[in-house]
Amino acid sequence: MKTVILSVNAGSSSVKLSAYTAEQGQSPIQIAEVQVSGLTAPPASLKYERGGKTIVKSREVDDQVSDQRDAFSLILKTLIEDDDLHDIQTKDDIGIICHRIVHGGDYTKPQLITNGTYHHLENLNDLAPLHNANSLPIVRLCVQDFPSARNVACFDSQFHSTIPEHIRTYPINQDIARRGRLRKYGFHGISYSFITRATAEFLGKDPSDVNIIALHLGSGASACAIKGGKSWDTSMGLTPLAGLPGATRSGSVDPSLVFHYASDVGKLSPASTKDLHISRAEEILNKQAGWKALTGTTDFRVIAAAATTTSSPTPSPNPNPNPNPDPNPDPNPDPQNQNHRLAFALLVDRISAFVGAYYVSLHGRVDALVFAGGIGERSAALRAAVVEQVGCLGFAADGDEDFDGDGGEGAVVVDVGREAAGGSDLGGRPRPRVLVCRTDEQFEMARMCAEDAEFWGSG
């Protein structure tokens, strides 16, 4: 029996919803997508697509739409009031609502949301105060207003439940660690689940036979070593702050840095509420760092353009420096361009370090290096710089400057490497591929729900 599945992805400044029809055990078919963005910088705007066709390109919405609950209510109203969207005419047409939850603690698979599940997610706010709080108000609204629908929590952390103990453990007192649930969890797991399946299909392999190094690069960025189709290691840790820098996140830094950065880091941030406790340290490293702190912008396109039109940010090591340097260097280089080059080079360095570490951790048995996420898909300059930096491991790009995420004729996975040129890696194995994957977290959540009999009332 066919039902409607809604996939809800609530961020700090936007709510995105994809609607699908599906039968149990079958692949979902997308019928609509709605996004409300700009919640933190009014006026917010709405974008609506139905059946792959743009219905509303961008429309400013009422000033009263100021938070995630308001945005979700507007999205639902948009769907129900569209007479041409025949599959959704009332709330009762919706069978399953799946919610992206960043931190799922020890959950290893999607969970049907009950009172017990919901209270457990509330308790996890202590571990992820800046992340889970965006999703829970919509979860609560859906549980109250959709009595005939099944609400399902899909966790960004669940994919990483396979990380071995020696990798996920922090070297601290283990009694305290167990009580406080202090260990590496990892995130972007819904995306990595999609990437693993899509890459395996592209390579003509079973997911259990695939070893890849995957990079989810967006305003939040992470890396993941995937061994036999399962997470082996990932750059994010207890929270999404660890690992790679992002638009406003520092990524991994010396843990004592923040205490030297400001004197009040242990105090609560003004952004805290009665139910949401955020320290100044968390606010500084999550909201006031990253490449925006270096350049003044969160737009990586601006950074990449400025960095790559001046000089290479990651020159290859040269044991014989140029004996004839420019006798007339620019005495007044543009400091803004210097900052952009610094941010670009810093990100390339951090990404390359994880690629190298994961290549070793996987014993050199790597089928592909996979770029995904908004920046991973669209920044040919970043891909080229990273691949050049890790070229000693056998990776090679094929000049994909024209691929900006919109090429590939709609393909989910595109080969941008030089596999066809032959060659081998350090171990004499065929050269690993360099791929771009258009990850789709909303689809992956809907697929998980469609395949699990429990969410259809038959498990």
UniProtKB/Swiss-Prot annotation:
Gene3D superfamilies per record: 3.30.420.40
SUPFAM superfamilies on file: Actin-like ATPase domain
Region (Disordered), start-end ranges: 308-338
Enzyme class: transferase
Highest taxon above the source species: Eukaryota
Keyword terms: ATP-binding, Kinase, Magnesium, Metal-binding, Nucleotide-binding, Transferase
Chain intervals with Pro residues compositional bias: 314-334
Positions with a binding annotation for Mg(2+): N9, E441
GO biological process, one term: acetate metabolic process
Pathway: Metabolic intermediate biosynthesis; acetyl-CoA biosynthesis; acetyl-CoA from acetate: step 1/2
GO molecular function, one term: acetate kinase activity
Site (Transition state stabilizer): H188, R249
InterPro entries: Ac/propionate_kinase, Aliphatic_acid_kin_short-chain, Aliphatic_acid_kinase_CS, ATPase_NBD
Claim: ATP-binding is one of the keywords in the record: yes
Binding, substrate: R100
Reactions it catalyzes: acetate + ATP = acetyl phosphate + ADP
A Pfam family recorded for this sequence: Acetate_kinase
Cofactor(s) needed: Mg(2+)
PANTHER family, alphabetized: ACETATE KINASE (PTHR21060), ACETATE KINASE-RELATED (PTHR21060:SF15)
Annotated family: Belongs to the acetokinase family.
Name under which the protein is recorded: Probable acetate kinase
Natural source organism: Chaetomium globosum (strain ATCC 6205 / CBS 148.51 / DSM 1962 / NBRC 6347 / NRRL 1970) (Soil fungus)
